[in-house]
Amino acid sequence: MNKENSSKLWKIIQEAGDYLVGQLPNHPNHPKGRNPYAHVAICVKSKFNASYKDIPDEQYDEVVKYIEFLKENPS
């Protein structure tokens, strides 16, 4: 992904993390609470099999839609 899209995507990931603070369900592996920023980044990496920086530019819109899905469906 080019630097401009990568920067935009990182900002969207941060905003999604801000939105999800306190919304993720409790988990026994995270007794002090879950990190919503890491959650979004890990979900993106898992779905697209690459770090957000390494996803092709052609998939930018798809990644943004997926992040919106994560915000609407905290898990």
Regions found by a protein language model. Name each.
Residues M1-S75:
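Positively charged, phosphate-engaging catalytic surfaces used for nucleic-acid and nucleotide handling
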